[in-house]
Amino acid sequence: EAKEERESSPRPVFRAKTVAATPREAPRPKLDHIMRLTDDVGIIQHAKFIVPDRRHGYCTDDNARALIAALMAQDMIADNKAVTSLSCTYISFLHHALNEETGRFRNFMGYDRRWLEETGSEDSHGRAIWGLGEAVALATSEDFRAAAGNLFENGLRALTNFTSPRAWAYALIGMHAYLRQFGGDSE
């Protein structure tokens, strides 16, 4: 009898739209601010409202993140030349940041284009590896992918001596992205 009653008047079930069930559509990115902050060296660390604050110069962390953002935007922006130009600027900064003698990325550069240290933090190195791994995965140009892959590989060796869990986490995210593109690479 209880079964018949339950079948004849079932309890209402609450069904809210969830993130998984709702199609996700991000708004088209606007590059005006990132372009304002970027010069021929890289992206400037800070701004006062919309004005780049040159007193703080540049850092590897921000250029690695800007590289990821630019490459993620490449399919959503009509002006692909601007995105390509930004991406090339950011990877060029990372190339210059790698100290080939130590295998480590420098982090801070003054607006006068002088490095403020010979070796950056482990965290900034991890973020550089993250950015380069994503660049390998997201690049549409084989030449760009090769440049990112070369820098990525040159920065890996230093990770073996790191003690920062955060640096390792960023590097692992970059390795995961790299392996999405080159899944069979075991070196």
Where are these regions (language model features)?
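Low-complexity, Ser/Thr/Pro/Gly-enriched N-terminal "stalk/linker" regions
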Residues: P10-R65, A69-M72, M76-M109
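Solvent-exposed loop and edge beta-strand segments that line ligand/cofactor-binding
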Residues: A47-A64, D79, Y111-H125, G155-W168, ...
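Well-ordered alpha-helical scaffold segments within catalytic/enzyme domains
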Residues: R65-A82, R127-D143, Y170-D185
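Extended, well-ordered alpha-helical scaffold segments
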Residues: D79-A97, T140-L159, G184-E187
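The C-terminal output helix
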Residues: A2-P12
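A contiguous, low-structure linker/loop signature
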Residues: H96-A137, S141-A146
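Generic hydrophobic, helix-prone segments enriched in Leu/Val/Ile
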Residues: H33-I34, A128, A158-L159, A171
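Hydrophobic, well-ordered secondary-structure segments
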Residues: G149-L156, W168-H176
